[in-house]
Amino acid sequence: MNRTTNLVYAGTFAGTLLALSLWSLKGAAGFSTADNTPVLNGKLALAFEKHYDEEFPIKKLGTNLWAALDYTLFGEGRPGVVIGANQWLFSDEEFKPTAAASQNITDNQALIQGVRETLARNNVQLVMAILPAKARLYPENFGEQQPASLHEQLYQNFRRIVADAGIQAPDLLGPLQQAKAGGQVFLRTDTHWTPYGAQVVAGQLATTIKPIGVLPESGNVYVTETLPGGPHKGDLTNFLPLDPLFEELLPPPDQLAKHNTRQQEESAPAGDDLFAETQVPVALVGTSYSADERWNFAGALRQALGSDLVNFAEDGRGPLLPMLKFLQSEDFKKSPPRLVIWEFPERYLPMAYDLSEFDADWIAQLKAAGRQDKQLADNTATNQGARH
């Protein structure tokens, strides 16, 4: 009996291996290279090895299988995602501790204050949009994992830092929490917010900005059209390599409608001044929350402010690098806007940044200006406290 069982196991294994090997030949059949690819120096062999490795089914099977085991048995994905409850996924950047967080916060605080000083010298008003973490807004959908203590007061501490620096930064947490009753403000399987969440933030920013009086009366009216959308594969599912073999285990995709904001009507320049200023008065700088048109944050801001804007946000670069790039740009140097809106997710404050693409002396000057500004603010606060 044991001999028969062993033979069955051996035969099954050999048959499976043979079948997978034959299946893998399909990928080899599709291999092709340029006619002039040299053979003797090994480039042809390396090209075939790379192609075969990508097409080899056992590799894909192993990847899918281990991902399925981690996900179903342990509730885990690849580094980058935290599995929550109710089919929710979170970025692990909102949960894990950050190395050298305290020093990073100090350095980034100096840079933020240096940015404010640079803008102020050019008569540019800065308003920051500090975005609360998705995890802060949806703690009811946590799984077993909880955010590290670093994140507990990060949003409140960030707002205090910018307030001490004299930077306008309206509270966005409260309005987003209230807006949850009307719909999702963040996508379930994605790092990013929904167009609805972006609209809520745009409205709150406009409430802060309009009384400042920094924007000219344009009379422009913007309207947003909502178009049929469809399933949205969230970026956090990329850390769950379950498809194609175990795709049914993935959380169901979010449904994402398309939003398009356009100017409804144009107003003529005031009076008879044919040379009235046509410069766009607002610059938006930030991350993929602002850069990605699917969330329509730039459009929502245009509608809420009644003003056009130029979007300098970039995808995959964090909030600091696009801002530093903007300050170095000819657009800013030759024609600075009246207002800069800086979208800055809270989770980026304790992170370290590679600033090697910028001149080291300029970065040092920016930090020094920021630290000097902080010291002046601290001394002012101390003197005011002494008077009382």
Curated annotation (Swiss-Prot):
UniProt pathway: Glycan biosynthesis; alginate biosynthesis
Q: Please name the Pfam families in this protein's record.
A: ALGX
Could you give a GO molecular-function term held by this entry?
acyltransferase activity
Question: How does it sit in the bilayer?
Answer: Peripheral membrane protein
Keywords of the record: Acyltransferase, Alginate biosynthesis, Cell inner membrane, Cell membrane, Membrane, Periplasm, Signal, Transferase
Where is the catalytic site?
A: 190, 192 (proton acceptor), 288 (nucleophile)
Q: Tell me the compartments it is located in.
A: Cell inner membrane; Periplasm
Signal sequence range: 1-29
Q: Which GO terms describe its biological process?
A: alginic acid biosynthetic process
Q: Per the record, GO CC terms?
A: periplasmic space; plasma membrane
Q: Give the enzyme class.
A: transferase
Known EC number: 2.3.1.-
The text of the family note is: Belongs to the AlgJ family.
Briefly, what is this protein's role? Together with AlgI and AlgF, forms an inner membrane complex which probably interacts with the alginate polymerization-transport complex and adds acetyl groups at the O-2 and O-3 positions of mannuronate residues. Acetylation of alginate increases cyst resistance to desiccation.
User: Protein name, please?
Assistant: Probable alginate O-acetylase AlgJ
Question: Lineage in the entry?
Answer: Bacteria, Pseudomonadati, Pseudomonadota, Gammaproteobacteria, Pseudomonadales
The gene name on file is algJ
